[in-house]
Amino acid sequence: MREADPECRFVWAEPLIHVAPKNHDREEIRAAEQFRCGQFEVYDMLTGHSRPELGGDPSFVDVIGLNYYPHNQWYLNGPTIPMGHHEYRPLGDMLVEVAERYEKPIYISETGSEGSGRPAWLHYVCDEVRDAQSRGAEIIGICLYPITAYPGWDNSRHAEAGLFSTIGSDGERHPYLPLADEIRRQQDIFAGLA
């Protein structure tokens, strides 16, 4: 690809997760950490840090994309870890870990929440991104996803997510104003840091 366009950049996206042990049993701790570290397998192979027979090289990754949602932290073979719980790992710490591991620019390739929690989730993610940036992580963007409400992927529930509603009886999509206000607020904060 770079022969055709030397300026092309390879941008990838993988989930960012945290998996905690359900108890302090040594085997449970080891298994949880092994599962958690599995999130790095793709980037390790692409960059040549593991499985060198696959031909990976650091030049194959220009930007690290990370998908992060409220349900991306859980106990091994168990439930989601709620934000604020002592086992919940701050997103900023997770971003710094990835930045130090790969020394590449990062962007949040997918993030968002459902219902009335959408603005608070974006506020949290942006605060954590700024925290990671203050510790040296190069984070170049955040992608709110999905941008519109949608029917559930594996059931018929209606997922009120993103900035815009489903198409209403007037044939239009309408913005969710609390999230629109939070987006503007976060844009102003980031602009003030530039």
Each language-model region and where it sits:
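Active-site region of glycoside hydrolase catalytic domains
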Residues: 1-118, 127, 131-194
